[in-house]
C-alpha cells in the first residue's frame, strides 16, 4: 500500500461519487472493498492509497491493459501538482520493463555462413 498519483478526466478533483459513476460508465469491474479504478493515461491527478496489483478491463481486446485499483480514495487533499521526481519514481508501478531481451533475430557473429 502506498500513495500513487493517478489521473482522471475532469479538470477539477472528482468526488468519490463521481469516481464511482465514472467506473460504471467505463464498465470497469469493481471488486469487494475497491472504491474505483483509473487509467494512467487519463488527464488530471487523483490521489489515493493503492494496492499495486493489476486488473484487466473485461471488455478490452488487449489483455495486457493495466488497471490499478485505489482502495482508500482521498478527496480531502488540495488539488496541487506533485514534484516531477515523485511522479517518475512511481512509474514502475504500471510500466512494464523494456529492453530486457534484444529484439534482433540474430547477431552477425552467430549467423551461419550462408547469406
UniProtKB/Swiss-Prot annotation:
One of its GO terms (biological process) is meiotic cell cycle. Keywords: Meiosis. Has a role in meiosis. This is Meiotically up-regulated gene 42 protein. It comes from Schizosaccharomyces pombe (strain 972 / ATCC 24843). The gene is mug42.
Amino acid at each position: 500500500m502506498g500513495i500513487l498519483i493517478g489521473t482522471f478526466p475532469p479538470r477539477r478533483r472528482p468526488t468519490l461519487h463521481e469516481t464511482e459513476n465514472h467506473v460504471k460508465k467505463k464498465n470497469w469491474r469493481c471488486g469487494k472493498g475497491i472504491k474505483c479504478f483509473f487509467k494512467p493515461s487519463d488527464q488530471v491527478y487523483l490521489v489515493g492509497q493503492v494496492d499495486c496489483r493489476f486488473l484487466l478491463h473485461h471488455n478490452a481486446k488487449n489483455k495486457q491493459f493495466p488497471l490499478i485499483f485505489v482502495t482508500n480514495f482521498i478527496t480531502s487533499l488540495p488539488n496541487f501538482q506533485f514534484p516531477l521526481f515523485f511522479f517518475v519514481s512511481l512509474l514502475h508501478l504500471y510500466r512494464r520493463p523494456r529492453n530486457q531481451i534484444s529484439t534482433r533475430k540474430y547477431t552477425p557473429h552467430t549467423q551461419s555462413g550462408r547469406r
